[in-house]
Swiss-Prot record:
Name used for this protein in its record: F-box/FBD/LRR-repeat protein At2g04230
UniProt keyword terms in alphabetical order: Leucine-rich repeat, Repeat
Domain F-box: 12-64
LRR repeats, residue ranges: 72-98, 149-176, 177-202, 204-225, 226-251, 271-296, 319-345
Residue ranges of every copy of the FBD domain listed in the record: 359-410
Residues in the signal sequence: none
Transmembrane segments: none
InterPro entries noted in UniProt: F-box-like_dom_sf (IPR036047), F-box_AtFBL13-like (IPR053781), F-box_dom (IPR001810), FBD (IPR006566), FBL13/AtMIF1-like (IPR050232), LRR_dom_sf (IPR032675), LRR_FXL15/At3g58940/PEG3-like (IPR055411)
Length: 448
């Protein structure tokens, strides 16, 4: 018994003798409630948790109450008590997950206390409870110079009658939050002079018909608008961000317009699942892009003509979209300096239309990019059995005079299909013959 006591004491001493930095790193990996519970282990641990740089609370996992009987008031008191006892020089982040029925006064106290502690990252995740939402007190955002990252999610109402002032905010995430009106959107974004990264997730435009994003400092923008059935279809987006470098738009469907002012510094744009935009040509706004990733059909959006993508060096298209090959022809003609072309089938051939319904009409004259600039051609999910895909591949190999490397990735063939092995080998030989006159191009075939 005495020997066991000595062993336990030695183990305790070993842990207690660890540097504070290492102990705090260990505690930071735990939920804040569990980290606080370690204070009973020994005198060494009693106040260690108060120096944690990151705090995270989730009312769903409150150890005092079960999931069916969560007491919002008790949860609020625990959060406030923890914040009031916090002694770390800097509060790096505060993550709060709570019910939509939580008292707005309590939420305001949390935010005010965190701001007073100089919090750099604030995450507010309010989950719906009986369709109730939390309205954030706008006065708390009237001035703050420490917050760098703000994430707001779900059952949160935003009403900003006047401009906020978040001087140091660099990243803003708006995930299914509800704005009172268009003015509230403007007052929030215009009050973030250092904003560089904005992510907007919406499932309906019931709150704001015209969602305007105006920010001269913005460099990265992601819009995901996967509106649910029965949502409004007459809204619009207006993007005024002259310094924008990276743009990602996904799911903007059946709206009146998506107007993007000329983004002259645009490096990369990805446009996915966009259709039914009635008034504006979204692609015409991307003419300065150096890299384009287009996951859309030319049947669903207006496609510009002319050599307007004169800075485009890399283009990626999805080959499962309807009449994708027509979009390819247009983009080849419109991109005189294209150097890299990537075709991808993300569905691994399972979602392609009947070959009898597909017909590719190649450009009448070889595009300038093929004759003078294209160096890399990659086709992932190349379906060698289809005549139309063979036509596209052959056309590019025949006309790309400066091509250095062409890679075709095909679906792996099972050993039981020996006949398909032979047919694929013949196809590969035919493509290789096309390149015999070009000793500089390296042809690669892969199976996935």
């Amino acid at each position: 018994m005495e020997q066991k006591f000595k062993t336990d004491s030695m183990n305790e001493d070993r842990i207690s003798d660890l540097p504070d930095a290492l102990l705090l790193q260990i505690l930071s990996s735990l939920p804040t409630e569990n980290a606080i519970a370690t204070s009973v282990l020994s005198k060494r641990w009693r106040s260690l948790w108060t120096m944690l740089p990151k705090l995270k609370f989730d009312s769903n996992f409150n150890p005092v109450f079960d999931d069916d009987n969560i007491d919002p008031t008790m949860f609020s008191e625990n959060v406030y008590k923890t914040l009031s006892l916090h002694k770390a020089p800097v509060l790096e982040s505060l993550h709060l997950s709570f019910e939509g029925r939580t008292d707005c006064l309590h939420v305001g106290i949390w935010i005010a206390t965190a701001f007073a502690r100089g919090v750099r990252k604030l995450v507010l995740d309010s989950f719906y409870q009986e369709d109730q939402t939390v309205t954030l007190p706008s006065v708390l955002f009237s001035y703050n110079d420490s917050l760098e990252i703000l994430k707001l999610k779900c059952a949160i109402d935003l009403d900003f009658p006047s401009r906020v002032c978040l001087k140091s905010l660099r990243k803003l995430y708006l995930d299914q939050v509800h704005f009172k009106d268009e003015e509230s959107v403007c007052n929030l974004l215009c009050g973030c002079p250092s904003l560089q990264d904005l992510v907007v997730h919406r499932y309906s435009n019931a709150d704001v018909a015209t969602f305007t994003i105006a920010s001269p400092s913005l460099q990265r923008l992601t819009i995901e608008d996967l509106r649910q059935e029965g949502g409004y279809g007459n809204g619009s987006y207006v993007i005024n961000a002259p310094g924008l470098k990276y743009l990602n738009i996904n799911g903007v469907i059946d709206i009146e317009s998506c107007l993007i002012d000329k983004a002259l510094e645009l490096e990369e744009a990805k446009i996915s699942n966009v259709s039914g935009i009635t008034n504006e040509n979204i692609l015409e706004s991307l003419t300065s892009a150096k890299r384009l990733i287009l996951h859309l059909s030319p049947l669903e959006v207006k496609v510009p003509t002319g050599k307007i993508f004169d800075q485009l060096g890399c283009l990626e298209l999805l080959t499962h979209e309807r009449e994708w090959w027509n979009l390819l022809s247009i983009m080849l003609d419109s991109s005189p300096k294209l150097q890299i072309l990537k075709l991808t089938d993300v569905y691994l051939h399972d979602n392609k239309t009947n070959p009898d319904e597909r017909k590719w009409n190649p450009p009448k004259c070889a595009p300038e990019c093929l004759l003078f600039h294209l160096e890399t051609f990659l086709w992932i999910g190349y379906e060698w059995q289809r005549g139309d895909e063979k036509e596209v591949a052959t056309y590019i190999l025949e006309n790309a005079r400066r091509l250095k490397k062409a890679t075709f990735s095909t679906k792996r063939i099972g050993r039981e299909k020996l006949e398909d092995f032979e047919k694929r080998r013949e196809m590969l030989n035919e493509l290789a013959i096309v390149l015999w006159d070009s000793n500089s191009c390296h042809l690669v075939f892969e199976s996935t």
